[in-house]
A protein has these predicted regions:
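Dynamic "connector" segments at or just before major functional cores
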Residues: 1-209
Length: 211
């Protein structure tokens, strides 16, 4: 027999939650490491900061990708997510159109500046690791194929697999699988094309940390 005599009901206030709880931990880590300040110090793309700084745009794009965003338009979902905004302590974030305008301000030099800002912040994490953390550092290079949805985007080409897109060069620290540098190339580029100067640059990252 089902009497239901052990059922209790409680009324609670309406709550808010995130689908991706880890974004808060990532944001907090970036704050403690001073990532935003390092980006703003090095990267100068905006003449005025009303109201956003370079770091606001960079982190906005990064968080969109981390939350499974596939395109700039997906940022609009975050703009209307009060729980997400509260989690970041933000009243608002850049809209998709503003974010698109920001990406078009980049050239090769500014992209390199951004990667170096991230690497400089990354070294703070390495310095806090055990003494033998980077007693040996292994640099890994590889090329991959990044397909696109169109055939008319600037710089793309047909890969040897018959896929239209790009063939980015990825330079990583094999010890931790961290991407140190990412270099975009046409889809028909061979894996090793242009890798030597980037390997040389990667060997300079974290030299003060290697023991």
């Amino acid at each position: 027999m089902m009497s239901g005599s052990n059922i209790h009901f409680e009324m609670a206030e309406r709550g808010r939650a995130l689908n991706y709880g880890g974004i808060g931990a990532i944001h907090l880590m970036g704050q403690r490491l001073g990532l935003a300040q390092e980006i703003d110090r090095r990267l100068q793309l905006l003449k005025r900061h009303l109201p956003y700084h370079e770091s606001d745009h960079v982190l906005n794009l990064a968080y969109n990708a981390l939350l499974d965003g596939q395109r700039l338009e997906d940022i609009e979902l975050r703009r209307n997510d009060e729980a997400f905004l509260d989690g970041l302590g933000a009243q608002r974030i850049p809209d998709p159109t503003t974010s698109g305008d920001f990406t078009r301000r980049f050239d090769q030099d500014s992209l390199l500046t951004l990667m170096e800002a991230i690497n400089a912040t990354r070294e703070q994490v390495w310095e806090k690791q055990p003494e033998d953390f980077l007693s040996q550092a292994f640099i890994d290079t590889d090329g991959t194929i990044a397909g696109t949805l169109g055939e008319c985007k600037g710089g793309m080409a047909l890969s040897y697999k018959g896929i239209w897109g790009y063939a980015p060069l990825i330079i990583t620290l094999a010890n931790t699988r961290e991407v140190l540098y990412l270099v975009n190339r046409p889809g028909n580029a061979v894996s090793h094309e242009g890798c030597v100067p980037w390997i040389d640059r990667a060997t300079q990252v974290g030299t003060s940390t290697c023991r």
